[in-house]
């Protein structure tokens, strides 16, 4: 685990974005942990979040031309990541996001920001079922652009309804890499360093045994 990944886990814990306990997911599964990126909700949170996304992006080495944030959660993420790339990595990258409803007046259309072209890095909070990615792919392809990769905050590394995860489905269907700031594996490595979190470690390991990929 890299220093920025450990720092991200601590940031998420401090903000109550990452919690341990017993949570029922939309799928009906009982999970020993829960991640709610919507709680990164202040100016300082966003500034820090962008730095972690930018770090993971640079670390991945994937070439891309533009950041795309799918509405709605992806919009602030794309914005803060673009700022962090400029301020901390000297990379001035264009960004773009979509509207859920196409505008009929003014400049019209359903895209805001830079022109959607070239190799696109899609940024979002998490991938649950991959629906937002599929909707975004329609927009990207309609504009003649290509998907360079997808960047999310957490990869839960668990099976969907079949034998592979929603993330593996996206990688298979679109031939792109999905990268994340942290994975379930990183989370377990962090818990292993914390004797006071031994109970949580046991339940997270058991969950991975049952649902992991």
UniProtKB/Swiss-Prot annotation:
Cross-referenced Pfam families: Pribosyltran
Any one of the GO CC terms: cytoplasm
Pathway of action: Pyrimidine metabolism; UMP biosynthesis via de novo pathway; UMP from orotate: step 1/2
Protein's UniProt keywords contain Magnesium: yes
EC number of the protein: 2.4.2.10
Entry binding sites for orotate: 34-35, 128, 156
Presence of the UniProt keyword Signal in the record: no
Catalytic activity: orotidine 5'-phosphate + diphosphate = orotate + 5-phospho-alpha-D-ribose 1-diphosphate
Gene Ontology molecular function: magnesium ion binding; orotate phosphoribosyltransferase activity
Keyword line: Glycosyltransferase, Magnesium, Pyrimidine biosynthesis, Transferase
SUPFAM superfamilies: PRTase-like (SSF53271)
GO biological process, alphabetically ordered: 'de novo' pyrimidine nucleobase biosynthetic process; 'de novo' UMP biosynthetic process; pyrimidine ribonucleoside biosynthetic process
Binding annotation for 5-phospho-alpha-D-ribose 1-diphosphate: 26, 72-73, 99-100, 103, 105, 124-132
InterPro entries tied to this protein: OPRT, Or_phspho_trans_dom, PRibTrfase_dom, PRTase-like
Obligatory cofactor(s): Mg(2+)
Complex and partners: Homodimer.
Family of the protein in this entry: Belongs to the purine/pyrimidine phosphoribosyltransferase family. PyrE subfamily.
PANTHER family, A to Z: OROTATE PHOSPHORIBOSYLTRANSFERASE 1-RELATED (PTHR46683:SF1)
Task performed by this protein: Catalyzes the transfer of a ribosyl phosphate group from 5-phosphoribose 1-diphosphate to orotate, leading to the formation of orotidine monophosphate (OMP).
Annotated protein name in UniProt: Orotate phosphoribosyltransferase
Organism of derivation: Enterobacter sp. (strain 638)
Gene for this chain: pyrE
């Amino acid at each position: 685990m890299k220093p920025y990944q450990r720092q991200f886990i601590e940031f998420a814990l401090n903000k109550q974005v990452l919690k341990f306990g017993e949570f029922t997911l939309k799928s009906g599964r009982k999970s020993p942990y829960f991640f709610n990126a919507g709680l990164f909700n202040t100016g300082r949170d966003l500034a820090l979040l962008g730095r972690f996304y930018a770090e993971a992006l640079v670390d991945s080495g994937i070439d891309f031309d533009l950041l795309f944030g799918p509405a709605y959660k992806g919009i602030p993420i794309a914005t803060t990541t673009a700022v962090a790339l400029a301020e901390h990595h000297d990379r001035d990258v264009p960004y773009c996001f979509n509207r859920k409803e196409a505008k009929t007046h003014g400049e019209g259309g359903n895209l805001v920001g830079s022109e959607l072209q070239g190799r696109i890095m899609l940024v979002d909070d998490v991938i649950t079922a991959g629906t937002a990615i599929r909707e975004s792919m329609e927009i990207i392809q309609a504009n003649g652009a290509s998907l360079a990769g997808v960047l999310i905050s957490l990869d839960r590394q668990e099976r969907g309804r079949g034998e592979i995860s929603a993330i593996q489905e996206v990688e298979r269907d679109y031939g792109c890499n999905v990268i994340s700031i942290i994975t379930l594996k990183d989370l377990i490595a962090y818990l292993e360093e914390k004797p006071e979190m031994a109970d949580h470690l046991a339940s997270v390991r058991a969950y991975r045994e049952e649902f992991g990929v």
